[in-house]
């Protein structure tokens, strides 16, 4: 009989859910059953929730499908019994359409279920766009795991990515997106990662849709020192947050009416920031002489009060600024006031942790353009997923991007689709890549005419159309100065300005170009023979770029030919003239002196002269020329040109007017002391330059002499890494180090490299850690007068005291965000770890520094607004139909 009654109640509840689900809209919901087999219905209605789930096949182009072990299926809802797993590729991404600027709940479910029979749950990273969201470790998660976040997308496209970090295979079971109410879950900065969402009831059941119209998932919780109260009356929930009515019909009060009602949670990192949302409703019938009134305290400090819960209606009290918990222990207390006759109550509450996503996504127009190109040519490259440019280690094959600074979206500067099997005409979507410098469409099957729009792309320096089947006449406008156009192997393409023969036929471009190329080759050979006769040289001669704008010559496969060809070779007399006979010396080193100069009468340059007495200097000179001819990044000092004439060797750089970072820490030479926020930005920009050398160059480079005097500052205090004389290339293959003669600056030198002569990119990371410590402390790297002479030893000893103020530069006068300071200090010590394997990569360093900068900027913005701040640090939101009582 009891069993029949249970089944009847279950049937009634199921019918009620279906009825409510039909009444409540799922508009904007994305509910993906990942790995749903093609032979199963899609969409389908999940019976317990009434939610409509669909196959994920239309939202991702990679992966294989699997199913948890059959004996485990009864423990999970249907969507969690299947999964999509990703044995191929480093990063695999879902592409979802969302509403730009609106807060969304994003939730993923991961259930291993021993689908592969190996009994080894995988570990991998979860990304939201270009930023890390969570690390998923299913080794001990029998019931799986379910990370959730509140996030405001900056575009109408959202990418959720699984990133392989080890030997195991990433997988996903369910992916859900829910648009939230306007103006809810807002932060000063960053997104909100769910920590707790609980309602207070002795029931074991959890709540979600349709009880919660936003499909937030609520777990029940009850403490042994509490007493439950409840009501059968209808409770209004019509404020912006709309917690489930079911959650509001129960509440907790302390059993000891005089005691506080306490909720506690622990923080792994004491610097973590939290937002708290507490939901109250008076569900008891109070007598005329009864009053319920209490204050809310967070970590012993008044959070809000007094609180008088509204009768059978909702009030939500929330923090509008982030909160931290000293020592990592968080404590929320509700304490009755002196005039209250009843203990405090709490119906439900939510706690979220702030997570920063500092990496800006690639320019939205560029992303749209390159995805249109991908769709037009039906390109199916495994790594063409999510953001095209960032993180840099996942940049799409065939692209190069510029990262001007940490507050500007990356832009696409190179598109290389050579030998990609392209067919059809040259798509007009290319013209929307408005910062494109290099376009390579060679060795495909493209047809039609060369489009006129290419001539309107003023940023283009190189266009390679070789090896296609293009026809018609090349637009005359593509002969503009500074543009290199290559079109060999298009027999039906007609060169601009070519004349018809007497028979009325145009000369094909290959003949014209061959004659021109032959003539140039003869001139070059004569010139080389003449120069050899005149004076033999042990240095390779680099010939200047031909001035003819349109030539049909074989395409060079250098990574950045447009950049390399722009470097100008100067004569010694030109160097003498530009420096006014070396009249203004602005620096000096072991290689020689650096003089100020001007090119073309206006462009300021720094001329680095090689001393004839410097034997090491000549090797460094050649290394620096070789490196700077093939690298280009906004945070690396640009090479304007060079001089290589007999015994006269010089490098001509852009002039960086604000000197080096060391001067702006010490105040030497009257330089202003930079504040903490500027230091963090400079550090992040220098880190971007190093990251480019490590993973953006082919082959990768190690700087080998990172120090504060080699970080220069331009007129806007943008950081530019300089002095590449000791730089070395790495093999592209499996080896991650090279053996070299020890070189570098004492104090900054990687101790592991010093003892083993094995150089790797982690050697730069160590040096950068020392630079960070200098920026934080303004202490000398080596000071023999200190008890701990090396800066890492001194900082390590001071860390034992736990007082950041004793470590920070006194010239900052305490004007810094302590959270960002601690985080930067921990990062610096991690970089300067004696063991290279324990040091982070520069990509990780960049992310950490960006997050530090976001924290510091948030503090500065808040402090600037304190004088005009009209709203309290806590906000109270009432039932929309209720007028709050006066106090």
Swiss-Prot record:
The modification Phosphoserine is found at residue 739. The modification Phosphothreonine is found at residues 571, 740, 745. Glycans are attached at residues 143, 230, 256, 289, 338, 363, 400, 416, 432, 445, 464, 471. This is Probable LRR receptor-like serine/threonine-protein kinase At5g59680. Residues 580-853 form the Protein kinase domain. The active site is at residue 705. One of its GO terms (molecular function) is protein serine/threonine kinase activity. Belongs to the protein kinase superfamily. Ser/Thr protein kinase family. Residues 25-510 are extracellular. ATP binds at residues 586-594, 608. Keywords: ATP-binding, Glycoprotein, Kinase, Leucine-rich repeat, Membrane, Nucleotide-binding, Phosphoprotein, Receptor, Repeat, Serine/threonine-protein kinase, Signal, Transferase, Transmembrane, Transmembrane helix. The keyword Kinase applies. Its EC number is 2.7.11.1. It catalyses: L-seryl-[protein] + ATP = O-phospho-L-seryl-[protein] + ADP + H(+); L-threonyl-[protein] + ATP = O-phospho-L-threonyl-[protein] + ADP + H(+). The chain crosses the membrane at residues 511-531. Residues 532-887 are cytoplasmic. It is a single-pass type I membrane protein. Its main location: membrane. One of its GO terms (cellular component) is membrane. Residues 1-23 form the signal peptide. The modification Phosphotyrosine is found at residues 653, 753. It comes from the Eukaryota. PANTHER family: OS07G0107800 PROTEIN-RELATED, PROTEIN KINASE DOMAIN-CONTAINING PROTEIN. It is found in: Membrane. It comes from Arabidopsis thaliana (Mouse-ear cress).
């Amino acid at each position: 009989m009891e069993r029949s009654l249970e089944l009847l109640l279950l049937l009634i509840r199921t019918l009620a859910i279906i009825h409510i689900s039909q009444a409540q809209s799922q508009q904007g919901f994305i509910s993906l059953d990942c790995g749903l087999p093609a032979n199963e219905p899609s969409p389908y209605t999940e019976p317990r929730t009434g939610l409509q789930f669909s196959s994920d096949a239309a939202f991702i182009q990679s992966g294989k499908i699997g199913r948890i072990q059959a004996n485990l299926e009864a423990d999970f809802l249907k969507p969690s019994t299947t999964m999509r797993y990703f044995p191929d590729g480093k990063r695999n991404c879902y592409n979802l359409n969302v509403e730009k600027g609106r807060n969304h709940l994003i939730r993923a479910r991961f259930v291993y279920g021993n689908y592969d029979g190996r009994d080894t749950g995988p570990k991998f990273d979860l990304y939201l766009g270009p930023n890390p969201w969570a690390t998923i470790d299913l080794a001990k998660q029998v019931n799986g795991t379910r990370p959730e976040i509140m996030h405001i997308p900056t575009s109408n496209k959202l990418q959720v990515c699984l990133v392989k970090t080890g030997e195991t295979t990433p997988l996903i079971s369910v992916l859900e997106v829910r648009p939230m109410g306007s103006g809810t879950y807002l932060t000063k900065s960053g997104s909100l990662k769910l920590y707790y969402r609980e309602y207070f009831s002795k029931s074991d059941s959890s709540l979600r849709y349709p009880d919660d119209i936003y499909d937030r998932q609520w777990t029940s919780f009850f403490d042994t020192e509490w007493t439950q109260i409840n009501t059968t009356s209808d409770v209004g929930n019509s404020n912006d947050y709309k917690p489930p009515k079911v959650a509001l019909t129960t509440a907790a009060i302390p059993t000891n009416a005089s005691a506080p009602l306490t909720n506690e949670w622990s923080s792994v990192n004491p610097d973590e920031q939290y937002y708290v949302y507490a939901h109250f409703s008076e569900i008891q019938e109070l007598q005329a002489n009864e009053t319920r009134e209490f204050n809310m305290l967070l970590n012993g400090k008044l959070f809000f009060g007094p609180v008088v819960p509204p009768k059978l209606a909702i009030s939500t009290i929330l923090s509008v600024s982030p909160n931290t918990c000293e020592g990592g222990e968080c404590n929320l207390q509700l304490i009755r006031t002196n005039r209250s006759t009843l203990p405090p109550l709490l119906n439900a509450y939510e706690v979220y942790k702030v997570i920063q996503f500092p990496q800006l996504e690639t320019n939205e127009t560029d992303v749209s353009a390159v995805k249109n190109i991908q769709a037009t040519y039906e390109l199916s490259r495994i790594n063409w997923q999510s953001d095209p440019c960032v993180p840099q280690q996942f940049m799409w094959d065939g692209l190069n991007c510029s990262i001007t600074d940490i507050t500007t979206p990356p832009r696409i500067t190179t598109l290389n689709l050579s030998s990609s099997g392209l067919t059809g005409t040259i798509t007009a979507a290319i013209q929307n890549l408005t910062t494109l410098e290099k376009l390579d469409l060679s060795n495909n099957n493209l047809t039609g005419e060369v489009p006129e729009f290419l001539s309107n792309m003023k940023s283009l320096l190189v266009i390679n159309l070789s090896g296609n089947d293009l026809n018609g006449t090349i637009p005359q406008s593509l002969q503009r100065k500074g543009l290199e156009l290559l079109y060999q192997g298009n027999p039906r393409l007609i060169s601009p300005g070519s004349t018809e023969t007497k028979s009325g036929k145009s000369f094909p471009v290959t003949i014209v170009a061959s004659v021109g190329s032959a003539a140039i080759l003869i001139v070059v050979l004569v010139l080389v023979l003449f120069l050899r006769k005149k004076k033999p040289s042990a240095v390779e001669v680099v010939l200047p770029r031909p001035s003819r704008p349109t030539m049909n010559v074989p395409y060079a496969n250098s990574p950045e030919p447009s950049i390399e060809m722009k470097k100008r070779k100067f004569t010694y007399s030109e160097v003498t003239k530009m420096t006014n006979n070396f009249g203004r010396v602005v620096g000096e080193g072991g290689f020689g002196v650096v003089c100020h100069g001007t090119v073309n009468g206006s462009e300021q340059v720094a001329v680095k002269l090689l001393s004839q007495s410097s034997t090491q200097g000549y090797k460094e000179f050649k290394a620096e020329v070789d490196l700077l001819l093939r690298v280009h990044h906004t945070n690396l000092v640009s090479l304007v040109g060079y001089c290589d004439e007999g015994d006269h060797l010089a490098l001509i750089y852009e002039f960086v007017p604000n000197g080096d970072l060391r001067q702006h820490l010490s105040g030497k030479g009257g330089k202003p002391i930079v504040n903490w926020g500027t230091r963090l930005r400079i550090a992040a920009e220098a880190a971007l330059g190093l990251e480019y050398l490590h993973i953006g160059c082919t082959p990768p480079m190690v700087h080998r002499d990172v120090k504060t005097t080699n970080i220069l500052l331009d007129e806007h205090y943008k950081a530019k890494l300089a002095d590449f004389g000791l730089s070395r290339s790495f093999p592209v293959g499996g080896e991650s180090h090279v053996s070299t003669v020890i070189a570098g600056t004492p104090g900054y030198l990687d101790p592991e490299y010093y003892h083993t002569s094995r150089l790797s990119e982690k050697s730069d990371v160590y040096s950068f850690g020392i630079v960070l410590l200098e920026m934080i402390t303004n202490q000398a790297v080596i000071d023999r007068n200190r008890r701990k002479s090396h800066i890492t030893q001194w900082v390590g000893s001071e860390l034992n005291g736990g007082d950041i103020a004793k470590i920070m530069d006194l010239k900052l006068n305490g004007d810094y965000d302590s959270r960002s300071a601690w985080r930067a200090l921990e990062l610096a010590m991690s970089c300067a770890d004696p063991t290279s394997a324990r040091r982070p990569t520069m990509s990780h360093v960049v992310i950490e520094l960006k997050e530090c900068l976001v924290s510091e900027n948030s503090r500065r913005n808040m402090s600037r607004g304190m004088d005009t701040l009209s709203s309290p640090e806590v906000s109270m939101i009432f039932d929309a139909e209720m007028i709050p009582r006066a106090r």
